[in-house]
Amino acid sequence: MAVVDGDSLRVDLAGSVIDVRLAGINAPESDECHADVASRSLDTLVADEAILEVVDTDQYGRTVGYVWSGAQLVNAALVERGDAIAMSNGKELAPALIDAEDSARLHRLGMWDPAACGASVVADVELEMTRPDPPRPDNEVLHDEIVTIVNRGVSDLDLTDFVLRDESSVNRLRFRPGTVIGPGGRLAITSGCDPQEGVGWCSTTPIWNNGGDSALLLAPGGTVVAHVRYAP
């Protein structure tokens, strides 16, 4: 097995090389903080002989599965170390993976360490899934799909170059210079464009998965400063 990144492997099966995506988790992308650590962690976990349990094929044609190293589930081990997040739609093992993520966050392991991406970042901020799944077909109500950032601090929160993301590898919103939330203030983020108040993501498709998702707020260096998960 050869490591491609923190949640992907290249596997030789009887002379046929296939790309494998670890099921139920998502590690930081190659250009994001903690990506190198996650890749090294996966490399260590599969250093000895590993067993692949195939469960699906993704939209890119990659095999999706669970990887076992002895009695250890590698997918879960990465989450337990804070080197990947648990996906809400991780199917039958989602509850166990989510529990592993909760433990990693509680103990500030890996990507959940306030100093994971350089100098320690402390921000008194919370995320609220205000309306992740509004009524009517999703593409018709992007302006009603809302996540809210709440400043619990006693001073202004400057969000310049902060990033709001979901569980996926693609949805990222970087805040423009001058985006500030006052003490005790709230900022609504809609998935559509041109909201009357707050900030518009201006996405052409829904951001938040109706079957459950997580929102993460990252400081400019990539440190996670707020996280919220919801289930339908």
Give residue ranges: language-model regions.
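Small beta-barrel nucleic-acid-binding modules, primarily SNase/OB-fold domains
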Residues: M1-P232
